[in-house]
Amino acid sequence: AAVRAETPFGEIRLEDWRRVLSIVLDGAFLCTQAALPHLVKAGGGTIINIGGLTAHKGADGRAHVITAKAGLAGLTRALALDLAPHHITVNCVVPGTIETMRGLPGAPERPQHRRSLPPVGRRGEPEEIAAMVRTLCGPDMRYVTGQTIHVNGGNLMP
């Protein structure tokens, strides 16, 4: 889940903290629980969580978002172990700066966005994230599980 919440840590209210963690972590938990019986019945499958780059880089005013997305990476690893006996792989794809409704091509560019372009010199396209998800869901990727895969144009190279 994409959560846009920028608040200095000292100003984050407990209700906002819990809301962000609920959107990200409860959302992944509930989706996985809903899908699990169907995946088990099918004899296996793939779960892909969508992480956040700030969980790996940090960012001002986003402690609650960073904590939630880092928790999602942990949940991915835990589920990979728990669900492996059911032939279910679980991975996390972490997009970089992507052309979305938040960064429409015709919208005026904010100076910090121009500075924050990745080494490839452009924002990614949603189709590039979809391609990674599609690849991870393919039959050639049954041995890949518990991984956090960054698709970010070189913005972070762990």
Q: Language model features by range: what are they?
A:
Residues 8-9, 16-18, 103, 114:
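Substrate-binding pocket helix/loop in short-chain dehydrogenase/reductase
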Residues 37, 81-85, 142:
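Alpha-helical segment proximal to the catalytic Tyr-Lys
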Residues 10, 57-63, 85-86, 121, ...:
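Active-site loop immediately N-terminal to the catalytic Tyr-X3-Lys motif
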Residues 118-129:
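A conserved structural motif in NAD(P)-dependent oxidoreductases
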Residues 52:
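Residue(s) in the substrate-gating loop at a strand-loop-helix junction
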Residues 84, 89, 144-146, 152:
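Short, small/polar-rich loop/turn modules that mediate ligand/substrate recognition or access, typified
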Residues 3, 10-29, 48, 65, ...:
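Catalytic Tyr-X3-Lys loop
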